[in-house]
């Protein structure tokens, strides 16, 4: 099922997963608009990381801002998975392989700042 959002003559069609992310972000940030914007950004980020390393900016847990190069291509993920992990969406995070640091990372939805 998809949701249509119409605001100021703008139409957005969001999947259920994107709407769920938007609700989580809106609850955490106190802004429905920010929830929708960041949820769409996450959708773009995940789609691009599945194809190639993608550069994005996010706030780390300690509050610092960092540029990341992340990837989730199936071939890499299969080669590096141990089978003991969990889906990032289960805990409202984006999981990815950090190309620069050489390990898995996760970023809370609301901490994604920009996809470059």
Residue ranges and their predicted role:
Residues 1-25:
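Eukaryotic low-complexity, non-globular regulatory regions
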Residues 2-6, 28-43, 57-64:
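Structural boundary micro-motifs
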Residues 16, 52, 62-64:
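Catalytic phosphate/metal-binding cores of nucleic-acid and nucleotide-processing enzymes, i.e., regions
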Residues 19, 25, 90-106:
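Terminal non-globular linear segments
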Residues 27-44, 69-83:
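Charged, amphipathic alpha-helical segments
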Residues 50-58:
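A short, Trp-centered hydrophobic/proline-enriched beta-strand micro-motif
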Residues 60-93, 97-100:
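Short, conserved turn/kink motifs that form compact alpha/beta structural patches or helix kinks used as
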Residues 75-77, 102-116:
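Structured surface patches comprising rigid loops and adjacent beta-strands/short helices at the edges
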């Amino acid at each position: 099922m998809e949701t249509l959002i119409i605001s100021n003559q703008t139409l957005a069609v969001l999947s259920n997963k994107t709407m769920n992310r938007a609700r989580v972000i809106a609850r955490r940030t106190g802004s429905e608009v920010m929830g929708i914007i960041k949820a769409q950004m996450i959708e773009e980020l995940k789609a691009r990381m599945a194809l190639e390393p993608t550069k994005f900016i996010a706030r780390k847990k300690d509050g610092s801002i960092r540029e990341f190069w992340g990837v989730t291509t199936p071939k890499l993920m299969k080669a590096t998975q141990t089978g003991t992990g969990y889906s990032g969406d289960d805990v409202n995070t984006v999981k990815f392989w950090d190309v620069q640091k050489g390990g898995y990372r996760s970023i809370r939805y609301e901490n994604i700042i920009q996809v470059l």
